[in-house]
Regions:
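N-terminal leader/targeting and pre-domain segments
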Residues: 1-62
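Residue-level hotspots within the lipid-embedded alpha helices of multi-pass solute transporters
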Residues: 28, 85, 149-152
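Short secondary-structure junctions and interdomain/linker hinges
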Residues: 32, 36, 70-78, 89, ...
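Hydrophobic, well-ordered secondary-structure elements that form the walls
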Residues: 38, 95, 162
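Transmembrane alpha-helical segments and their cytosolic interface motifs
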Residues: 55-99
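Outer-pore turret/helix-boundary of cation channels
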Residues: 83-119, 139
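Pore domain of cation channels
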Residues: 108-168
Length: 168
């Protein structure tokens, strides 16, 4: 197969054949130690999977694959995962800051400052949970749980994408 064939398959909407060609290129480059090129074709192969899901009107899987592309470049970009992690921490911090009485300082009883919101978000995201600042009310507790689960997922994904870069 040639790269021209892939372009023709994509233009014609034959995403399965394009995916097969991308997979062959990926495997060929990987077996020859050209890991950056293999990564490119791995991403292209995954994009064809997503396009096939769109063709088949399987929008649930299409959405998951699109989300996976955005946050990690289909598992090929540790930088994307890191940027998603930073963005998530900042968004959760802003959400907590916008909630009146959302957090409480258990140690000093003082008002929560802007840096405290960021600190709480990092501690919750990384699931350290020192207990000095705690969520108050059901909404703040649910947001904390959501952030902690997001943290576990994204930290695991970061380890996987970094490992793929180091091992290959």
């Amino acid at each position: 197969a040639r790269i021209d064939d892939v372009v023709n398959y994509e233009v014609e909407g034959d995403f399965k054949r394009a995916q097969d060609v991308y997979r062959n290129f990926k495997n060929s480059f990987r077996s020859n130690g050209a890991h950056n090129r293999a990564s490119y074709f791995s991403i292209s192969e995954s994009k064809m999977s997503r396009k096939m899901m769109g063709q088949e009107k399987n929008y649930g899987i299409w959405s998951l694959l699109y989300f996976y592309e955005i946050i990690s470049g289909y598992g090929e970009s540790p930088l994307r995962v890191f940027m998603t992690t930073v963005t998530a921490i900042l968004i959760f911090s802003a959400i907590f800051a916008s909630m009146p009485e959302g957090l409480q300082n258990n140690v000093t009883g003082e008002d929560i400052s802007t840096t405290d919101y960021l600190y709480y978000s990092v501690v919750t995201f990384t699931t350290l949970g020192y207990g000095d600042i705690v969520p108050v009310g059901p909404l703040a507790k649910m947001l904390s749980i959501t952030e902690a689960l997001s943290g576990v997922f994204l930290m695991s994904l970061l380890v996987v994408t970094l490992s793929r870069r180091i091992i290959t």
